Amino acid sequence: MNPFPRAEISSSALQTNLAALRQQAPASRVMAVVKANGYGHGLLNVANCLVSADGFGLARLDEALELRAGGVTARLLLLEGFFRATDLPLLVGHDIDTVVHHSSQLEMLEQTVLSKPVTVWLKVDSGMHRLGFTPEQFSTVYARLMACPNVAKPIHLMTHFACADEPDNSYTSVQMAAFNSLTAGLPGFRTLANSAGALYWPQSQGDWIRPGIALYGVSPVTGDCGANHGLVPAMELVSQLIAVRDHKANQPVGYGCFWTAKQDTRLGVVAIGYGDGYPRNAPEGTPVWVNGRRVPIVGRVSMDMLTVDLGQDAQDKVGDSALLWGKALPVEEVAEHIGTIAYELVTKLTPRVAVCLA
C-alpha cells in the first residue's frame, strides 16, 4: 500500500450526521455548509453524499459554480455574497442565492441590468461586528432592496453568532433578541443557527439551520466531542510507519534535538508532516493511534515525517497504519493537544494528501 497520507471520507458518516442534525432541528431546513473544499473533505464528495440536504452554503462563487458543473441542483447560497458587478449575471444564470451584507453590494444590485432578479439574504449585524448591516442601517437597506427590481421577493433574513460555541455565554441570547426584534413581522426565511446554534441553542433554529463542522462529525465546542451528539467523524487521516528503530536513553531525536529519551525505547517514523498540513507546532505528547493505542509524538514535526514513541516492548513494524485523527482518535482531542481548533486541522491539509471516499 502507498505509504503516504490519505484522508478517507465516510459517506455513511456524513449522512448519519445530517440525519442527527435534522433530529436536533426537526422544524428547520438544512443549509449544509461546504465551503473551504467541504471543510477539507472534498467539495463534490460532500455535496454528492449530502444530496438530501435542502441547500448548500459556500464562501465563494467558484465553489458554487463547481457544484453546478458537478450536477448539484439544490439551493446554493454565497455566504459572503458577491464582490463584482460581473458576478451578478452568473448568479442569475446558475440560480445562486447571495447574501448582501455591505452597501457596495447593494449599490451594484441597484446599478446593474439583469435578465431576472436575484434571491437575496439580507445579513443583519446582531452583535458579531464582522459582516452585516447594523440595526440603525437595517430599515433603510431593507427598503432599498424592496424597491430594487433586481432583487427577488421576499427578501430572506440572516445573522451569525459570535459566541454560540460557548453554551453558557448569554451573548447569543442578546443577538437572538436583537435579530428577532428587528425583523419581526417581515416575510421571508430566517436563518440564525450555525452548528453550535443548532446543537446548543434550539430557540435559534428558525426556518433554516446552517451547520458546517457538525456535518463532518466534529463538535463546535472546545472540550466537547461530536459523539456526544450522535455525530460520527467523517474523516480518517491515515498514514504508515516507514521506519521503526531502537533508541537509547539520553539520546535526542529530530531537528533541534528538543526531545531526549529518558529510557531505552523504540521509535516509529510516520510518513506525514507539515508539508501535508499536519501542524509543525504539535507538541511532545500529541497522540497518534497505532495498533489500537495512543502513542505520543516526540521531537519536532518535520516537512514529511513525524516521530512517535512506541514504547520499549513495541512490536509495531514498518507498514503498520498510523491514524492521525478519526473515529478512534477524535480530531477534537488532537486539536486540544496542539492548541488549535478542529476546523483548522481538517481544512489545512495540503494537496499532497489524497482525499478519497471510503
Curated annotation (Swiss-Prot):
Pathway: Amino-acid biosynthesis; D-alanine biosynthesis; D-alanine from L-alanine: step 1/1. Keywords: Isomerase, Pyridoxal phosphate. Substrate binds at residues 130, 303. One of its GO terms (biological process) is D-alanine biosynthetic process. It is an enzyme of class 5 (isomerase). PROSITE patterns: ALANINE_RACEMASE (PS00395). The active site is at residues 35, 255. Its cofactor is pyridoxal 5'-phosphate. It holds the Pfam family Ala_racemase_C. GO terms for molecular function: alanine racemase activity; pyridoxal phosphate binding. The modification N6-(pyridoxal phosphate)lysine is found at residue 35. Its EC number is 5.1.1.1. Catalyzes the interconversion of L-alanine and D-alanine. May also act on other amino acids. NCBIfam families: alr. Belongs to the alanine racemase family. This is Alanine racemase. It comes from Shewanella baltica (strain OS185). The gene is alr.
